[in-house]
Amino acid sequence: MDKISYISKIKNKFDEFKEDFNKPYNKNRRNKFIKTAFSSIVRTIFLFGLCFVILFPTIQQLLMSFRAPSDINNPAVIWIPMQWSIENYSISSLVLDYPKALVSTFTLSFISMILQLASTALAGYAFSRLKFKGSGILFLLVVITIIVPPQAVQLPQYVYFNNLGLLGSQNSIYLMSGLGMGIRSGIFIYIFRSFFAGLPKELEESAQIDGAGVFRTFWQIMLPNARGAIITVGLFAFVWQWNDTHFASLFEVDHDGFPLLSMRLLNVVDGLRQALTYKGIIGLVGQEVTDNPLFLALITNVSALMMMAPLLIMYLFVQKQFVESIERTGIVG
């Protein structure tokens, strides 16, 4: 009798569970939980895969950069060096003329960034608020500059700057940036125009009632509210100028008195022999350096890491503001 009663209780419990399980409310909650869990798993796998693709080569090159030059031809060394050394950084520093080139590159990028911000912000504000005859056509031409490669206009640019006597000087870069013709200026004008167009017109109307003119309204009202666009454009302008080789080569900006990291990295082969001769280790890998592509690739990678390091450090300090500004300006992709 007790056994039958026990089985009956189990059956009742099972029936209650089945009834509760099939209730629409619980069924919806269960389906929602499954979808959320599945979405989280897929998202996590995707992010791990993306991080691996991005971080794997960086970590690999970072470990290889501490490999002693004598281990270059050692097939047993794949990831972890057998002999740890900073000799590669010492050689790369000589190849890049690193301390001097770092200061020169930072100076060029920073001043160019400030000039780009000033010129493109003014142009973006004019296109968004100051409607004048032909403004639509002019803005269309600005958009076209985004898709036209800089190589298409390099010949007239070279001729004009040569006639102005600006070749071999960083003033050529400053002039282009200040006139809204710098690297990717069309994109920056588009960003500022879109941002200013999204601000309420009541801000300007209030300023005009108080007697503010166009420039005062721009400087005191519009620009302080464009913090997101300023951070976005500023970072892009700085990084793109930092990595530029096209205009630096076209206008012959790089020279012994004003070395640039990007150009020294581009010509690492030419500087490597001089650096090794200077250090008295031209045969440190057992043969002529030009005959050893592994050593050449190693020094190139180390030089790239040294060039990239200041940008990574800068990004660590501004990553929060940069992400917020990207969300405000609506840039995707």
Region spans (language model):
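A structural signal for multi-pass alpha-helical bundles of membrane permease subunits
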Residues: I4-N12, D20, S39-G333
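Short, Lys/Arg-rich, polar N-terminal cytosolic tail immediately upstream
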Residues: M1-I34
